[in-house]
Amino acid sequence: MNRQRVAVLALAAALGWAGAGSAAAQPVRQQLPGGLTVLVRENTATAVTAASLFVRMGSRWETEDDAGISHLLQQVVLKGTEGRSALEIAETAENLGGGIGASADLDYSEIRATALARNWRTMLELIADVALRPTLPTAEVDGERRATLTALRSRQDQPFSLAMDTLMSRVYGDHPYGRPILGRPAALERIDRARLVAHHQRFYRAPRMILAVSGDIDTRLVMAEVARLFADAPTGPAVGEPTLPEAAARADRTVIVRASAQAQVLAGFLAPPTSHADYAAVKVLATALGGGMAARLFTEVRDKQGLAYVTGGAYPSREGPGVLFTQLGTAPANQARAEAAMLGELDRIRREPVSPAELARAKGYLLGQFALDRRTNARLSWYDAFFEALRVGPGFAERYVRAVEAVTVEDVLRVARTYLSTPTVVTLGPGAQ
């Protein structure tokens, strides 16, 4: 066993990867009679307790007509409940020694909170109040709509954000993953309070909710309190899965001519969902290409050729079709050469296997980052709810670690040849062509 692997496994043990007898090894999962899924993880390592309430509501269930409605709803749920004003919600969270927030994403929406462990009951009551009894004041809806429209316009003025939004649109086509989570301006202009209320009533139902709690807590007491707090949560009718257009890989190149001190070059490829058997191997592939300062793009394009200021690559986890993308920022004068160099590395990793040293580095970096990201109860509860929402279930974190450890040089070459054959390229800069 090489020293890098020993170091990675030592870090894993130190940071509490499951399977090593840690008190936080596995959450207890229970589905309440109304359909709410509860995951409780006892972790005595810190005095802070955290909870994440996930709702299966997000861009995946939206259309062009209501694109952005989930994000808008999540911005307004904290603006008041039947028993608390927006200020009282914020003050209650602060008095618990923590905070509360809400957001939306492609496959889920979340209400999250943290508190000192002794205040866990009030923390859960606050989450339930916000989730089940928001008032969604008209003035707040209007204000958050304006703020979201401003944010969308701002993204058009940010070169990287504009290039990334364009890449996702070109990779996914008409699939909802191709739209910004913030939505579309035309759709947002049509969304009023009545539509937000209807959206909340449709999606904030017990069978669509996942509540994960992590901290110095007693599982039995938490389960009983959650059952009490969510006893009146609506249960039906069920919301069916959306009929989504197929995302089909296609070679494509988009040029955006835009004044910018730094040119952007991005390449994207359709990739498998998180539940796919190739998930771990594609994660390693993406890390070998763009993860950290020893990755291919950093060493070959930035260090050796001097053609980039920044490089990167990622493969975000999705319930539906994923995307593997690579990115670099460069001087406008080097844009064409930088694009050719990046595409050359993407082609090379399809033709030539990575070395055993590259494989070990990529796996070590990937697993080390994963361990570091799971050090706090806030992140542990988020991951527990996230993996449940993506339908890969309890224990996925441990299965994922084992799957990454098992990835071989041959696996990386195979998935590179499978998924990197049809690049979608976006290039942005003052002299882009």
What are the roles of these predicted feature ranges?
Residues A238-A294:
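His/Glu-based metal-binding/catalytic segments typifying zinc-dependent metallopeptidases
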Residues A50-A117, P180, G292-L307:
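M16/MPP (pitrilysin/insulinase) zinc-metallopeptidase core fold and M16-derived inactive scaffolds
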Residues A18-A25:
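Boundary at the C-terminal end of the N-terminal hydrophobic targeting segment
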Residues M1-R5:
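Positively charged n-region of N-terminal signal peptides that target proteins for export
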Residues A25-F54:
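Mature N-terminal segment immediately following signal peptide/propeptide cleavage
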Residues Q31, E88-A238, V255, P273, ...:
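Charge-rich, well-structured scaffold segments of protease-associated domains
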Residues A7-A18:
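Bacterial N-terminal signal peptides
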